[in-house]
């Protein structure tokens, strides 16, 4: 998460990532305990390592109108939804996360949307392309 305008002290274990055009997010994902994101596709990569996500959706209605999302987007979130800055601040300061519910949501989400197996991925892709 990067936001130079946060107006409260954060615990020492929370780090900001400075945006860099050559930065590879995948290098740090395994080191991250909890990801705070919005609608970014990085969440999909992060869920593969089965860790917790907080969705900071302060502009949901605006984003839904302008960009669009699937109808049940909020219902299938594999993590906690935060709707405003005050909730985000409280969530970060409390460091309290409903681990069982979130872990269960991650498992269900992964099974429903990404359950294709991780074994022999390169071989499967090669065979798929070969058979086109």
Feature map (PLM): residue ranges:
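Short, flexible, glycine/charge-rich loop motifs used to bind or transfer phosphoryl groups or to couple energy/partner
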Residues: 4-9, 24-25, 44, 69-72
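A donor-sugar binding/catalytic signature common to diverse glycosyltransferases
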Residues: 22-66
